[in-house]
Amino acid sequence: MKKVLIISITAIISIIVGLTAGYFIFKGDTTNNVEETLPKPEISEGIRGEQFGIDKNINESTIDEYLGRSDSVYRDMRMLKDPGNYEAIGGDSYLSGFVEGFEVVPLPYLTNVTGLPEDVGETYTGDTLFTQDDSGNYVANYEESMEILEAIFPKDKNIFLMCGGGGYAGMTKTMLVSLGWDENKIYNVGAYWSYNGNNKVEVKKTIDGEDYYN
């Protein structure tokens, strides 16, 4: 059991460090961002809010204004290659890119994921830090599970969450709040697939109709 835990931790840390190394120096001066008071999380209207819980004020369209804050952490909840068929709903199973400064922490490594669209199918179903039971409670699979989660999502920081379409980010916020995090410090920024800002780090390139991933 301890060996499995070490492997799981190593996988998460390797993805975080390996993918985002070198992307933590932001272009321009973001010092003023730290001094600004953040608006409280507010759910968007319509399907973006009702289904995904994407924030009304801090989302794909505005996140550039809130990057580089020393009082915040930035987490992208996607997998490098998701077993789910996200192409079936207009997305990308591969991590085709990310917003500069966001660290990749795949939700399916943290807890089991259910309720995905039928066309997408199943995502990763291996070992996880937590298991969500039939009652919606998150049960730690290891003694160290909570300690690891608190290291990834510091409770004294604002937490900005993103993913491909907004679903994994919303599920992550639900999990954290259920486990004792302050919901007023967690923002579901929404969908990378809808992001058109100035801090996009491209991983996917299409050449002569073929997709390539750096």
What are these regions (language model features)?
Residues K2-N57, G68-R69, L80-N214:
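Rhodanese-like catalytic fold shared by cysteine-dependent sulfurtransferases
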